[in-house]
């Protein structure tokens, strides 16, 4: 994928830092959850409404999320080096998954406990269970 596309995704994520947290949120004014952050950062590559909405905070949606991002528009990454703009799926608890976007400054994600979108430095405190990159145009 061209570097400028990866930078655009990372910058869109960084622009959301400070936005309020809201479970299921897709609007920065009302609030975003982790998947809402990913949907808005990918604007221009996917329609935000395409991203799955029927999940719960502690739901088992790994298969649904993986199937969505494994489609043709995304490259499923194995153990390759991580790059700014990569989409990360982490397991924050035994049955709790969480999405984030890698940037050169750290990882952007919606933090339910802090009630806002935050930038967290690496390394992440959670194991990665999935990683995708938007394919180039």
Label for each model-derived stretch:
Residues 2-10, 50-121, 137:
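...with weaker cross-activation on analogous glycine-rich loops/strands in unrelated enzymes
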Residues 18-22, 112, 136:
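A broad detector of the eukaryotic-type serine/threonine protein kinase catalytic domain
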């Amino acid at each position: 994928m061209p570097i400028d596309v990866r930078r655009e995704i990372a910058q869109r994520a960084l622009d959301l830092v400070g936005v309020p947290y809201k479970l299921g949120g897709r609007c920065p004014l009302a609030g975003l959850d982790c998947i809402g952050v990913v949907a808005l950062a990918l604007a221009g590559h996917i329609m935000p409404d395409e991203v799955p909405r029927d999940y719960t905070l502690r739901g088992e949606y790994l298969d649904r999320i993986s199937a969505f991002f494994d489609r043709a528009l995304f490259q499923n990454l194995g153990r390759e080096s991580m790059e700014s703009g990569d989409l990360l799926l982490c397991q924050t608890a035994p049955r709790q998954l969480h999405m984030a976007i890698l940037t050169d400054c750290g990882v952007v994600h919606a933090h339910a406990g802090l009630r806002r979108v935050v930038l967290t430095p690496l390394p992440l405190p959670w194991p990665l269970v999935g990683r995708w990159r938007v394919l180039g145009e």
